Swiss-Prot record:
Keyword entries, A-Z: Membrane, Transmembrane, Transmembrane helix, Transport
One Gene Ontology cellular component: membrane
Family named by the database record: Belongs to the multi antimicrobial extrusion (MATE) (TC 2.A.66.1) family.
Tree of life domain: Eukaryota
Annotated Pfam families: MatE
Protein name: Protein DETOXIFICATION 15
The keyword Transport appears for this protein: yes
Membrane topology classification: Multi-pass membrane protein
Compartments where located: Membrane
One example GO MF annotation: xenobiotic transmembrane transporter activity
CDD domains, alphabetized: MATE_eukaryotic
Listed GO biological process terms: xenobiotic detoxification by transmembrane export across the plasma membrane
Major subcellular site: membrane
């Protein structure tokens, strides 16, 4: 040991270099262990909707169009909003876990569940009136009627989806994501059987796919809830139901509201708005058939970024947080190059996954290069958005996204798509312009960040949470 210290003193540069290399290697391993499962979870949960629509496709083109439009409408008005709301947990749970205030995670999850359940009530009313909204925005009445019916049968899904998002982020903050992968895998596998029974055998027709979504989401919630309740790995973070979850709702909402209007809502809303607008183009089926699955890869990286940054800030390690940002951005660049290259290489054959119609195949082939560019830009900004959530910059992120998408992206996309008759390409070019503006703004914010100050903010946030926890224990408000 003494000789090793003498060597370090004699060769300070070499020792420092080896130390940095070890830290980088450890950070890479941590993020791979996080991002890999998170990508799998995103893909598996996204596949629920895809599988449902695929089964509906066997019933004809009209039910397929209706289910696709209803799914997009549900995403705009429900799923994305709840996903954005739940992302507030990335900040509070991640930083509390990093600060070793484990008991606060359970209270924060319960508080988030309460808020998301209450928000689901008005959102379900919106879903019940889907047909009227679609007709108002100019959709074909026959498609709007079927879409409205599909959306009404999806209403039970929204309550389960909110709870599922809370459970996912509760475990993600603890770097415990393998159970989420397993439960999602089991649910998605069973979803195929459930869809087959309800869509093709029960007589429910295309409405059976919506019912299948609800069953599968609730099944996933039950599986994860059982894990949290009975697993020893959650014994410190889940200490039972607490009355304290009902306290400090207003301060929590100050983080929830900008979270809901950040990446998971403003960005997704703009994207889904353009998808719904594509239904007003001459061939809506073609415009809504473009692949979105690859977006789940940077979304998984974003989850890893928010978790690692929030954990390091909570533990009082500014250098660790900065290193986490550098590593995840490197992952993002590599991923965007690989996926973009693959999309371009398969552009002439990917269309056959949707149809044997030469028009469809040709259309998809012309769209994929644009999608490849969009994905590369989206990967970069999605990861930066994860960094923002880990730091608690939701308000800043909301304003950046508002300007990027609604002052630049959506107007430019609609202008190209409809006024200049560029079609679906114009809509996607609008999204690309928004991604460029968003990426530049978030990059500048991250580059000029004072990480020591961010640690102080995280410490203050975790300390206030700890005081709430101590109050809860002293007043006997922790319930079994």
């Amino acid at each position: 040991m003494r000789e090793e210290r003498e060597d370090m003193l004699s060769w300070p540069l070499i020792g420092e270099k080896e130390k940095r290399s070890r830290f980088v290697k450890e950070e890479v391993e941590k993020q791979l262990l996080l991002s890999g499962p998170l990508i799998a979870v995103s893909l598996l949960q996204f596949c629920l909707q895809i599988i449902s629509v695929m089964f509906v496709g066997h019933l004809g083109s009209l039910p397929l169009s209706a289910a696709s439009i209803a799914t997009s409408f549900a995403s705009v008005t429900g799923f994305t909003f709840l996903m954005g709301t739940a992302s507030a947990m990335d900040t509070v749970c991640g930083q509390s876990y990093g600060a070793k205030m484990y008991g606060m995670l359970g209270i924060q999850m319960q508080r988030a569940m309460l808020v998301l359940t209450l928000l689901s009530v008005p959102l379900s009313i919106v879903w019940a009136n889907t047909e009227h909204f679609l007709v108002f925005f100019g959709q074909d009445k026959s498609i709007a009627h079927l879409s409205g019916s599909y959306a009404r049968f999806m209403i039970p899904s929204i309550f389960a989806y909110g709870l599922l998002q809370c459970l996912n982020r509760f475990l993600q903050a603890q770097n415990n994501v393998i159970p989420v992968v397993i439960c999602s895998g089991v649910t998605t596998s069973l979803h195929v059987i459930i869809c087959w029974v309800l869509v093709l055998k029960s007589g429910l027709g295309f409405r059976g796919a919506a019912v299948a979504n609800a069953i599968s989401y609730w099944l996933n919630v039950i599986l994860l809830s059982c894990y949290v309740k009975f697993s020893p790995s959650c014994s410190l973070t889940w200490t039972g139901f607490s009355k304290e979850a009902r306290r400090d709702i207003i301060p929590f909402m100050k983080l929830v509201i900008p979270s809901a209007f950040m990446v998971c809502s403003l960005e997704m809303w703009s994207f889904e708005l353009l998808v719904l607008s594509s239904g007003l183009l001459p061939n809506p089926v073609l415009e809504t058939s473009c692949p979105r699955t690859v977006w789940m890869i940077p979304f998984g990286l974003s989850g890893a970024a928010s978790t690692r940054v929030s954990n390091e800030l909570g533990s009082g390690n500014p250098k660790g947080a900065k290193l986490a940002v550098r590593v995840v951005l490197s992952f993002s660049i590599v991923e965007s190059i690989l996926v973009g290259t693959v999309l371009i290489l398969i552009r002439k054959i990917w269309g056959f996954a949707y149809s044997s119609d030469p028009e469809v195949v040709s259309h998809v082939a012309s769209m994929l290069p644009i999608l490849a560019l969009g994905h590369s830009l989206d990967s970069f900004q999605t990861v930066l958005s994860g960094v923002a959530r880990g730091c608690g910059w939701q308000k800043i992120g909301a304003f950046v996204n508002l300007g990027s998408y609604y002052l630049v992206g959506v107007p430019f996309g609609l202008l190209l798509g409809f006024h200049f008759h560029v079609g679906g390409r114009g809509l996607w070019l609008g999204i690309i312009c928004a991604l460029i503006v968003q990426g530049v703004c978030l990059s500048l914010i991250t580059f000029f960040t004072n990480w020591d100050e961010e640690v102080k903010k995280a410490t203050s946030r975790a300390k206030s949470s700890s005081e709430v926890k101590e109050f809860a224990v002293d007043n006997g408000s922790i319930l079994v």
